[in-house]
Amino acid sequence: MNFVEELTWRGMVHTMMPGTEELLAKEQVTAYLGIDPTADSLHIGHLCGVMMLRHFQRCGHKPLALVGGATGMIGDPSGKSQERNLLTEETLRHNVACIKKQLAKFLDFESDAPNKAELVNNYDWMKDFTFLDFAREVGKHITVNYMMAKDSVQKRLNGEARDGLSFTEFTYQLLQGYDFLHLYETKGCKLQMGGSDQWGNITTGAELIRRTNGGEVFALTCPLITKADGGKFGKTESGNIWLDPRYTSPYKFYQFWLNVSDEDAARYIKIFTSLSQEEVEALTAEHAEAPHLRVLQKRLAKEVTVMVHSEEDYNAAVEASGILFGNATSEALKKLDEDTLLAVFEGVPQFEVSRDALAEGVKAVDLFVDNAAVFASKGEMRKLVQGGGVSLNKEKLSAFDQVITTADLLDEKYLLVQRGKKNYYLVIAK
């Protein structure tokens, strides 16, 4: 498999230094990609870079995932409009450990293969590097004129914020450049990959290597992922879509991919899955014949959810989706854990009732009219129940004066009332 050809048909090549493809064709190459450890989880904005490393390893080359323990303590100005908060060493070590665990789902760190993946942390070689060492070994090789010409620097200096660029952030490109030099000298690393906003930092590293020891190295960047409507990829109203289920439940993760537009699904299925070109072309053709069936979105959501979480989490997410949008049973509803239940019914009207009252038993008509205003009046509720239009926990309410107790609670806390086909209400016992 040819790595550059693989990335090209997937739409994952933005800029490539001349000679990169020739280098990859003649030898097993070691390449690295930097990951910012400012959180203890990756989010889907990291996924394109991680998939580059995955394809790189599958093509027989050796991937290095560099977590910027040192550079993360400073913050990269590329694409940023303001200074970043600095992280403590303890926080960074925790974040790095969590990120490695997530990367292990995409990369082979364990085998004896010569191209097994490695995780490196630039804090390990920067922590004892004094400022005088840095000035002598790195600073003297790159001119301020060269550094000032970078887009990331110019954008901050001329930006609307008018708060300039700190010396700390200005030197970031030299620190990242030194990473490339260090990995070139210690690991034989000849290629750096990253997002297109990293091109300036990557070429600084290549220039540093050329000026210090005459070495020739290469660079390849992927496009920054966007949405067809111009919105920011990977962001929702509630923030990032994280890979860690503590921050984004597998159900919400699955729903994100399931709900992308047709245009985005056609691009994302190439970038975020390992499906072959033939499989993608077949799915795209099938989708074009019946777009309403959302074949691309369903397959995209399946592939990414299984890869990031598990087959079990994917199946649970599909089942949970059916509860809101299909004819699910009460058994399926009872199987949901609390986090998924709340994720599925996020945004539906919620009411609180007394747990003590439920312990003694309350007539449904009193509970859902007086205690929780699900219905406007007892007469309205009686009429709907008689017409079979009210369900409790996905089972038809048999009588409007049926007694409800704590035994009816889901997860010992919730009652799900359904009025008609589409109106849901969540009643919480407190």
Swiss-Prot record:
Database matches in InterPro entries: aa-tRNA-synth_I_CS (IPR001412), aa-tRNA-synth_Ic (IPR002305), Rossmann-like_a/b/a_fold (IPR014729), S4_RNA-bd_sf (IPR036986), SYY-like_C (IPR054608), Tyr-tRNA-ligase (IPR002307), Tyr-tRNA-ligase_bac-type (IPR024088), Tyr-tRNA-ligase_bac_1 (IPR024107)
Residues noted as binding ATP in the record, renumbered to the chain: 235
This protein's record includes keyword Protein biosynthesis: yes
Keywords in alphabetical order: Aminoacyl-tRNA synthetase, ATP-binding, Cytoplasm, Ligase, Nucleotide-binding, Protein biosynthesis, RNA-binding
The reaction(s) this protein catalyses: tRNA(Tyr) + L-tyrosine + ATP = L-tyrosyl-tRNA(Tyr) + AMP + diphosphate + H(+)
The protein's enzyme class: ligase
Chief place where the protein resides: cytoplasm
Entry EC no(s): 6.1.1.1
One Gene Ontology CC term in the entry: cytosol
Location in or out of the cell: Cytoplasm
Motif 'HIGH' region positions after renumbering to this chain: 37-46
Pfam families named among the record's database cross-references: SYY_C-terminal, tRNA-synt_1b
Motif 'KMSKS' region boundaries: 232-236
Binding residues for L-tyrosine: 32, 172, 176
S4 RNA-binding domain span: 362-429
GO terms, biological process: tyrosyl-tRNA aminoacylation
Domain of life of the organism encoding this protein: Bacteria
A molecular function GO annotation: tyrosine-tRNA ligase activity
Role this protein plays: Catalyzes the attachment of tyrosine to tRNA(Tyr) in a two-step reaction: tyrosine is first activated by ATP to form Tyr-AMP and then transferred to the acceptor end of tRNA(Tyr).
Assembly: Homodimer.
UniProt cross-references to HAMAP family, sorted A to Z: Tyr_tRNA_synth_type1
Protein family per UniProt: Belongs to the class-I aminoacyl-tRNA synthetase family. TyrS type 1 subfamily.
Name this polypeptide is given: Tyrosine--tRNA ligase
Organism: Phocaeicola vulgatus (strain ATCC 8482 / DSM 1447 / JCM 5826 / CCUG 4940 / NBRC 14291 / NCTC 11154) (Bacteroides vulgatus)
Gene label: tyrS
